[in-house]
C-alpha cells in the first residue's frame, strides 16, 4: 500500500496547479482487498493533495484494457504478467511498479464438488474473467496436470460465491484473499488450488501506462 502511495507522489510531484487533473486507473477485478492501497489513497484525499482526481474503474469484460491504454482512453491500468506478450507484439506499454511479488489468483472449489486434485478438472465448469490464459500462473498449474484449456467449460463470473454451493459452477478463479474466506462463511468447505504450491510463482498486479502517456508526463 505504501509503495503505491509513494509511487503516485513520485510520478506527480511536478504538478503544481490547484486545478485537479482527472486520470483513470483500470483495475483487473472488482473492488477487494488487494486494491486497498489505491482505494484508501482516494478516500483519504492523497490523490487530491497532489492535484489528481483519480477515477478507479472496476473490471468490465467488454473493455479491452490494452487497447484502452494505447489509445489514450485510460491513463493507467493494473495488468498481469502476460501483458509482456502484448509488448512483444508491439504494444507500447511502460511498467511502473509490480505490486505483488506472487500472483494472488487461485482456483477455489467446495469439497462437495468431488474435486480433490487438478487432474479432476477435465470437463469441469470454471467461472473466470473470460480468458483463463491471461494468468500465466493458473495456466501453468493446470497444464502441469495434463489439462488443456479446451478441456474446461469457461463461464462468465457471477461474483456470487454461493454458486459453488448451489452447483451452478464447479470452480471459481479468484483472489486468495476473497472467495475462500467467503465460501467458508457461507458454510462451505473450500479447497484451494494455489499455483505457488505447485511451483508456479509469478509477479502480478503490475501498474502500467502507455509510452505515449509516460512521455507526455515527463515533458510537463
What are these regions (language model features)?
Residues 7-17:
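Hydrophobic h-region of N-terminal signal peptides that target proteins for export
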Residues 19-31, 52-58, 123-127:
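Short, well-ordered beta-strand elements
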Residues 22-41, 60, 71, 131:
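Extracytoplasmic "Venus flytrap"
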Residues 23-27, 91-100, 124-127, 191-198:
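A structural signal for short loop-to-beta-strand junctions that line the ligand-binding cleft
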Residues 81-83, 157-220:
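Pocket-lining segment of extracytoplasmic ligand-binding domains
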Residues 110-125, 211-219:
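Flexible hinge/capping segments at coil-to-helix
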Amino acid at each position: 500500500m505504501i509503495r503505491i502511495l509513494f509511487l503516485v507522489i513520485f510520478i506527480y510531484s511536478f504538478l503544481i496547479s490547484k486545478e485537479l487533473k482527472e486520470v483513470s486507473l483500470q483495475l483487473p477485478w472488482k473492488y477487494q482487498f488487494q486494491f486497498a492501497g489505491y482505494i484508501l489513497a482516494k478516500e483519504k484525499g492523497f490523490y487530491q493533495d497532489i492535484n489528481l482526481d483519480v477515477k478507479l474503474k472496476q473490471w468490465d469484460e467488454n473493455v479491452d484494457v490494452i487497447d484502452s491504454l494505447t489509445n489514450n482512453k485510460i491513463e493507467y491500468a493494473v495488468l498481469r504478467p502476460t501483458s509482456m506478450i502484448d509488448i512483444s507484439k508491439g504494444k507500447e506499454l511502460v511498467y511502473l511498479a509490480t505490486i505483488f511479488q506472487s500472483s494472488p489468483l487461485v482456483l477455489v472449489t467446495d469439497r462437495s464438488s468431488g474435486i480433490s486434485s487438478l487432474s479432476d478438472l477435465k470437463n469441469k465448469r470454471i467461472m473466470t474473467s473470460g480468458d483463463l490464459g491471461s494468468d500465466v500462473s493458473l495456466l501453468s498449474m493446470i497444464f502441469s496436470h495434463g489439462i488443456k484449456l479446451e478441456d474446461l467449460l469457461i463461464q462468465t463470473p457471477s461474483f456470487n460465491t454461493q454458486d459453488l454451493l448451489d452447483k451452478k459452477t464447479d470452480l471459481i478463479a479468484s483472489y486468495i484473499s476473497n472467495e475462500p474466506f467467503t465460501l467458508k462463511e457461507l458454510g462451505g468447505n473450500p479447497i484451494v488450488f494455489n499455483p505457488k504450491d505447485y511451483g508456479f510463482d509469478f509477479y502480478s498486479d503490475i501498474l502500467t501506462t502507455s509510452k505515449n502517456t509516460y512521455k507526455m508526463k515527463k515533458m510537463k
